[in-house]
């Protein structure tokens, strides 16, 4: 996806402008409503094992935050569909609210500063290798999520 995708995740263009640009780019004659409905298909299921780990970390006194590249279309959908995510996190940082997106170094630096975290005391998980590299460049321990066992396997060693 092109620059309109990145602009949308930074909150720089409206949902309607994004839908129009993407439909034009992909030669899809969709209405805004059709596009919006299809755009939510990316959400397939909650990961209860990860939610449980997040709760356990918080019970142990760790701060758990989520950093997500997202957009207004998704933020009107997933909080209602998956309230467990918000309940399991101390804070959720969204690219569209911050005006920056992963893998830009400044987004990781922003979260570190806002949370009072040092890179060496932070662990970051993502399923995108570019985002892992971006976090690594600011000194954050970063784990590429390859499948549903990556996060539970990592914390099985740490939490036991």
Spans of model-derived segments:
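Asp-based, Mg2+/Mn2+-dependent phosphohydrolase catalytic module
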Residues: 71-72, 76-160
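N-terminal helical cap/lid subdomain that shapes the substrate entry/recognition surface
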Residues: 1-52, 59-60, 71-75
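A generic structural motif
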Residues: 61-63, 140
């Amino acid at each position: 996806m092109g620059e309109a995708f990145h602009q949308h995740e930074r909150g720089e263009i409206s949902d309607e402008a994004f839908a129009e640009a993407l439909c034009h780019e992909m030669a899809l004659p969709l209405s805004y409503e059709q596009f919006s409905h299809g755009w939510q298909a990316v959400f397939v299921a909650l990961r209860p094992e990860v939610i449980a780990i997040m709760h356990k970390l918080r019970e142990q006194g760790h701060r758990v935050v989520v950093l997500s590249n997202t957009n207004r279309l998704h933020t009107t959908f997933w909080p209602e569909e998956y309230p467990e995510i918000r309940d399991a996190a101390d804070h959720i940082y969204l690219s569209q609210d911050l005006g920056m997106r992963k893998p830009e170094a400044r987004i990781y630096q922003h979260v570190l500063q806002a949370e009072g975290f040092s890179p060496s005391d932070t662990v970051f998980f993502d399923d995108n290798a570019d985002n892992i590299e971006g976090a690594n460049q600011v000194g954050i321990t970063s784990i590429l999520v390859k499948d549903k066992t990556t996060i539970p396997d990592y914390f099985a060693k740490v939490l036991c």
